[in-house]
């Protein structure tokens, strides 16, 4: 049916083209067209109220399949406003552009009587001068709006062939003058303001309002649109995988860390430098995991994304600050105690006497707490745009307070471990490693330091790779916005550019595997088993002593009873 109408219109257009007056376009008559009142803007999304001629009393509409064409027009207008929102810094006279767009898709309507009891509703097209004003002040609109199409944007008016409906004057051509919204714009522009619309899932938040500015929203200039939280670097399913990984590993790792703390820090009577290092490392990892356990209890999204589109900050969200503090102290201490263990391994192999161990304790604790105080006092803890934890998100603060100093520590630890390996290689040339008690005692610490140092080296590589490509990730947001503007499924298939998923997944895996790693290396050792064995022996002895005391007391009481009974018998005999 549509093809027949188009062919008829095209033949008519060719017939009339030579005799068509200048400044006129040719319009197509739709028998289903009606002049109707504007259905109105939705409650939550203003569009064209106060921007239509006659206050929207006569809008050209068609009714088909129980759907008012105005509804479809509103959807098209909303998409146009979305595009206009993101090119607003390239345009002037933005409000007039929105007036024009409203009157293009919600055209004024004229009713004409062509025969007794026969009325025809015809659209009044936007004048070419108004169209030219729109694209001149906003050239990017010219990519979507072609003002040279005369039947959409006539200079004077539109001619409709109503001869089939009984109209005979002017050869059956009925003239409808074009509509210029300039007068309406001049009279009512003070009642309106430029309407920004953000394509889903972006949200609109006024950046000039203190309620929203600098509270964890990530704005997309030049708009007031903010990225969703969490940022859509990956699909929802992949984010769930990372979250589930964190939940499972953090819980297991926390339990393993507590076990090591009890085994080497509390139950162990005779504490050595290595048992202190193991306890300190396990406590550090437990702090990291404790932050995750808090998020599991409260809910990851409630902690990291307390409001739609807003990432948590320590100023407005105390739980974010708490989990960030636990994570920061934990991860700093893990690096420092790993380095401490590497230094002591090297000193043990080389028989070098170091300064007193308490200085390591003071430095490691002091640095972790000092860097925490600096970051917290500057309010630098917040949830990241692509992270499942709160931490330092300011680039220079994170580099100065963690990556640089801890990188130096890891370098020192790596040098120490490399030296230890070289020393072991030298020893292995002369004797079997199994015959060297000193080296055999250091095997497990060496393995743990190598694995932890290797894991942190991987984290460093990932971090600086993200930093190196950060500019590319930011510039790729343009492609993400274009995808949203052209999307028909609310942007479900659109994703921002970020780190590759697999390396990012492993990034979180390593940070939450340390507790399990230390348990496998130390928690299953004879030293750990002996600590618990001694505890069980103490409990058993204590229970035995208690039972014996109760038994003795019970025995003594029965003897007295027997003696009393015997005395009573003697009295009876007397």
From Swiss-Prot:
A single BP term in Gene Ontology: cell surface receptor signaling pathway
Cystine bridges: 35-109, 48-102, 91-138, 127-178
Residues carrying sugar: 119, 161, 187, 206, 233, 244, 486
Signal peptide: 1-19
Keyword hit for Disulfide bond: yes
Low complexity: compositionally biased ranges: 550-568
Annotated protein name in UniProt: Frizzled and smoothened-like protein G
Membrane topology: Multi-pass membrane protein
One Pfam family matching this protein: 7tm_2
Extracellular side of membrane: 20-246, 295-324, 380-401, 467-502
Ranges facing Cytoplasmic side: 268-273, 346-358, 423-445, 524-574
Organism: Dictyostelium discoideum (Social amoeba)
Family that this chain belongs to: Belongs to the G-protein coupled receptor Fz/Smo family.
InterPro entries: GPCR_2-like_7TM, GPCR_2_secretin-like, GPCR_Fz/Smo-like
GO molecular function, one term: G protein-coupled receptor activity
Region of interest (Disordered), ranges: 550-574
Start and end residues of each FZ domain: 30-181
Localization in the cell: Membrane
């Amino acid at each position: 049916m549509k093809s027949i109408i188009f062919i008829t219109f095209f033949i008519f257009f060719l017939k009339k083209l030579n005799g068509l007056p200048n400044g006129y376009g040719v319009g197509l008559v739709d028998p289903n067209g009606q002049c109707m009142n504007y259905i109105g803007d939705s409650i939550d999304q203003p569009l064209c109220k106060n921007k239509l001629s006659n206050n929207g009393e006569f809008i050209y509409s068609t009714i088909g399949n129980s759907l008012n064409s105005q509804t479809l027009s509103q959807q098209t207008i909303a998409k146009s406003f979305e595009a206009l929102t993101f090119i607003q810094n390239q345009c002037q006279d933005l409000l007039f552009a929105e007036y024009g767009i409203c009157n293009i898709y919600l055209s004024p309507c004229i009713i004409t009587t062509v025969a007794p009891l026969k009325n025809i509703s015809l659209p009044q097209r936007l004048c070419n001068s108004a169209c030219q004003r729109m694209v001149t002040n906003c050239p990017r609109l010219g990519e979507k709006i072609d003002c040279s199409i005369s039947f959409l944007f006539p200079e004077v008016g539109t001619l409709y062939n109503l001869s089939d409906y009984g109209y005979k004057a002017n050869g059956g051509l009925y003239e409808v003058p074009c509509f210029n919204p300039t007068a309406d714009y001049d009279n009512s522009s003070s009642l309106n303001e430029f309407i920004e619309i953000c394509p889903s899932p972006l949200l609109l938040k006024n950046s000039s309002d203190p309620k929203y500015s600098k509270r964890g929203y990530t704005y997309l200039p030049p708009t007031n649109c903010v990225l969703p939280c969490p940022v859509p670097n990956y699909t929802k399913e992949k984010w769930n995988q990372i979250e589930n990984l964190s939940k499972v590993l953090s819980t297991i790792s926390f339990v393993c860390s507590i076990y090591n703390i009890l085994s080497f820090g509390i139950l162990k009577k005779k504490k050595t430098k290595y048992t202190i290092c193991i306890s300190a490392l396990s406590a550090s990892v437990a702090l990291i995991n404790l932050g995750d356990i808090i998020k599991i209890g409260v809910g990851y999204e409630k902690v990291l994304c307390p409001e739609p589109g807003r990432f948590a900050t320590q100023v407005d969200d105390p739980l974010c600050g708490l989990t960030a503090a636990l994570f920061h102290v934990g991860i700093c201490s893990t690096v420092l105690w790993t380095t401490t263990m590497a230094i002591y391994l090297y000193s043990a192999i080389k028989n070098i006497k170091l300064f007193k161990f308490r200085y390591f304790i003071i430095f490691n604790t002091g640095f972790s707490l000092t860097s925490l105080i600096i970051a917290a006092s500057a309010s630098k803890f917040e949830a990241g745009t692509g992270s499942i934890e709160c931490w330092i998100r300011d680039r220079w603060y994170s580099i100065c307070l963690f990556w640089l100093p801890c990188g130096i520590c890891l370098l020192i630890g790596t040098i120490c471990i490399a030296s230890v390996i070289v020393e072991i290689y030298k020893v292995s040339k002369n004797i079997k490693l199994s015959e060297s008690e000193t080296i055999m005692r250091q095997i497990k610490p060496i393995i743990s330091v190598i694995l932890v140092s290797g894991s942190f080296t991987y984290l460093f590589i990932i971090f600086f790779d993200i930093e190196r490509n950060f500019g590319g990730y930011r510039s790729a947001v343009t492609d993400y916005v274009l995808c949203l503007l052209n999307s028909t499924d609310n942007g479900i298939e659109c994703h921002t550019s970020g780190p590759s998923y697999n390396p990012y997944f492993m990034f979180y895996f390593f940070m939450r595997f340390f507790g399990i790693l230390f348990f496998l290396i130390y928690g299953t050792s004879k030293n750990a088993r002996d600590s618990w064995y001694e505890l069980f022996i103490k409990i058993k002895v204590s229970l035995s002593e208690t039972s014996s005391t109760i038994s003795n007391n019970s025995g003594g009481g029965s003897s007295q009873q027997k003696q009393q009974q015997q005395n009573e018998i003697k009295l009876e005999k007397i």
